[in-house]
Amino acid sequence: AAEPSAPAPSQEPTAEPSTAPTTEPTTPAPSETATQDPPQPTAEPSAPAPSQEPTAEPSTAPTTEPTTPAPSETATQDPPQPTAPAEPTIVSRADWGADESLVADPPSYLDKVDAVFVHHTAGTNNYDCAESPAIIRAILTYHVKTNGWNDLGYNFFVDKCGTVFEGRAGGVDKPVRGAHTYGFNGYSSGVSLLGDYENGGTPTAAAKQAIADISAWKLGLHGVAPEAKVTLTAAGDTGVWNTGDKATLNTISGHRDGYATLCPGATLYSALPEIRSTAGASIYTS
């Protein structure tokens, strides 16, 4: 059965920070700036052309043709060029049955998505994937009615079968500001995997692939490489960073990289290098 109340994980912040976006009940976070380091990869350079042949003939040309044939010319293939990752299939809010009457205010938007933070919901792992919509509906109710937020905190959900679900309203291809990583909501998108990955749960291959796919696509919309680093200015004291600190993070990071929490759980956090690598490969194969 679906989680009856989808309680928020104890390691997640229980309230939206005092510097939350205008869509949240509290005042906006201080102005945040981000500088990406390094920038999105540009196209690989093509192989340099060989140096030109000498224009002057040698002073003593050979009297006969050389006995050994000249080496045959072989074409070399240019390295693959990066491309924008394809948009994965995303289950819309309408399709998973979001109660839009719970959402009173319109979404707010970022200038750019510089990073993706990966989370877990810390709920049960013993669910059928057909129950995923009901679980997300329960989380929506909890985030609005208990946490006092305007909408879901996360921008996307992924279940163990690898299905991606739209989270906070505002447009999956838009830089919608969420409420998921205190101090860094002003730069990022949040992706949460249904289940608990701190207390024995292990992310499935399908879930890891889906997290990589949605992260690569979301970052790609903003010209951000999924295996890069980015420097973000902390907008609050997070237990890991102080207000104003310059935090250099992976563009696909775990919640614990920005905030003092166990989220996204030990096993999911340890899978992030693989997820980053998979996301990076997608920009050459999509």
Residue ranges and their predicted role:
Residues 1-9, 13, 17, 21, ...:
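Cell wall/extracellular polymer interaction/catalysis modules
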Residues 3-6, 75-110, 115-117, 121, ...:
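Basic/polar, cationic surfaces and motifs that engage anionic cell-wall
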Residues 150-151:
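Carboxylate/His-rich catalytic cores and anion/metal-binding grooves
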